[in-house]
Amino acid sequence: MTLGPIMLDVVGTELTQEDIRRIRHPLVGGVILFARNFESPAQLKALTDSIHAVRQPPLLIAVDHEGGRVQRFREGFTRIPPMREFGKIWDEHPRKARQLAEEAGWIIAAELRAHGIDFSFTPVLDMDYGESQVIGDRAFHGDRQAINELAFSLMQGLKRGGMAAVGKHFPGHGYVVADSHVAIPVDERDFDQIASTDMQTFRQLIDDGIQAIMPAHVIYPKVDNKPAGFSERWLQKVLRQRLGFNGVIFSDDLSMEGAGVVGDVTQRALAALNAGCDMVLLCNQPDKADELLANLKWDIQAQSLARLARMHGGRHPSSMVALHEDPDFMHAVHRVGQVGKADGDLPFA
């Protein structure tokens, strides 16, 4: 059975029969995990093993594990600071900031891969304009050069740990105040303004080989009246053709308020897939998941399957014990653990 175009969540810390029924459906290609799915490192590894055992090829398993306030697994995992902290260091010590960002990426990937997670939806490539609370300290900086350097470093660290990177939220979510989880944000800038600022960070990371991108549930009415994640203009004409992106396009969560302008859950999924998404996410609404699985008609294209296959995690440590026996890894954990503390404590070794 090939991977399908839908990524769903599961209810709790172990699979229920309803979970298994859903993720066995041929339209499903992945599972996204949340904090409610985590009790302990051992339980998490058992859960991912059970998810991977349901299908061949195994389903993709993903998580939002950016650091700061968006880190789903905490006990037994290294606390990763918000990305803004690396930006603060970059202002004074760019080389050290790049080194620390790369180490943070390595830690994120290695720890998640040791627990059977294929990838995290990270890094955030949005610019920090100081207005968006939902982005806020999740962004590296307000300066494009800082974002480019730090995001590239984080991506290199993820790669070292066996994990692909997912840049978000194309073409930029940082300029709008509204939170697309609960509202429909509108960015009134014209295309040239966006292309010369926010979009440049995506262009650079695409040139650097980023493997996946997630578009924003933001409407840019001077470009298209649909949110970017449902816009063929943004995804095909700009992202694919103009920027030359050949990786995976993941929709943001179809249950978010910012997706509501498109219609019901099936209409949302169809709109995203037709616009150019390879895989759509639907989270926290099992009844809507059942509705989508019952009603969506979609034959996934060979090109999408090839892209998605590259999101499976690479080589990884057999366990956290093995990681903790690696002195280089533990030194990285110590250095990243100092980020965000008083300047005098920064690990400038």
Curated annotation (Swiss-Prot):
The record marks 179 as: Important for catalytic activity. The active site is at residues 181, 252. It comes from the Bacteria. GO terms for molecular function: beta-N-acetylhexosaminidase activity. The keyword Transmembrane does not apply. Keywords: Cell cycle, Cell division, Cell shape, Cell wall biogenesis/degradation, Cytoplasm, Glycosidase, Hydrolase, Peptidoglycan synthesis. It is found in: Cytoplasm. GO terms for biological process: carbohydrate metabolic process; cell division; cell wall organization; peptidoglycan biosynthetic process; peptidoglycan turnover; regulation of cell shape. The keyword Nucleus does not apply. GO terms for cellular component: cytoplasm. It holds the Pfam family Glyco_hydro_3. Substrate binds at residues 64, 72, 138, 168-169. HAMAP family: NagZ. Plays a role in peptidoglycan recycling by cleaving the terminal beta-1,4-linked N-acetylglucosamine (GlcNAc) from peptide-linked peptidoglycan fragments, giving rise to free GlcNAc, anhydro-N-acetylmuramic acid and anhydro-N-acetylmuramic acid-linked peptides. This is Beta-hexosaminidase. It comes from Methylobacillus flagellatus (strain ATCC 51484 / DSM 6875 / VKM B-1610 / KT). The gene is nagZ.
